[in-house]
């Protein structure tokens, strides 16, 4: 929630694997009754965000993603992950539907700062945090995205004009989920592929930060990061998930597999 506000100008491949080792997926709770899933709210030191995707490792530990800036400490306008302050790895994160807090086990912001990252696009749009759930809650998790179903895979390419889908869960909507499903178009990628600019109805608002983005085939491609006022008012910046996960693995982060949804992907509602 901290970062997804109006900030001027900025204000993150087909055939890719599901990012991680070839491990058997855990047994998931039924989607209809699972209280923990993509789209639930997370709370980090008072900052509310929306969870994106579910992940697991070779030992069947279960994780859920949020934006790295959800643990930021420098306020809403601090968007450069190589400079902005962050709570440390190990910070507890409340995940709606879970009985116990999870733990922040990876932050792209913390990792970039400790490694001296200097690439401008990476610093601006590498915006993912990984929360390890408490084992007591593993049996409460389903990886399906509400309303849309999926994800069905992972892609690093969404061309200008391609359909995009998301599901946000800002507390500003006061529990009204009618506007949570989002459908729109990609306006193209920039920053060396790190950022997808998208326009959806309705746009992402504070509290939707971190929410999942998938393409018209249900493939995961991004994490909601920013609300832009230029060049297109109410457009959103979406960090590229494939690059975020590759960066995590190559910089000592957990080696995770993106969990596929158990529910069929319904596809876009509009042509």
Can you say where each PLM-predicted feature lies in the sequence?
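Secretory targeting and sorting signals
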Residues: 1-24
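Intrinsically disordered, low-complexity segments enriched in polar/charged residues with Gly/Pro
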Residues: 2-3, 28-29, 39-41, 79, ...
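Short, solvent-exposed coil/turn segments
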Residues: 9, 17, 124-126, 193, ...
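Generic marker of residues within folded, mature protein domains
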Residues: 14, 41, 120-121, 203
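Compositionally biased, intrinsically disordered/low-complexity regions enriched for serine, proline
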Residues: 18, 23, 27, 32-35, ...
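Extracytoplasmic low-complexity, Pro/Thr/Ser/Ala/Gly-rich segments
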Residues: 25-59, 68, 257-271
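Serine endopeptidase catalytic core focused on the charge-relay Asp
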Residues: 37, 43-53, 57-190, 215-216
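Active-site region of chymotrypsin-like
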Residues: 139-149, 172-271
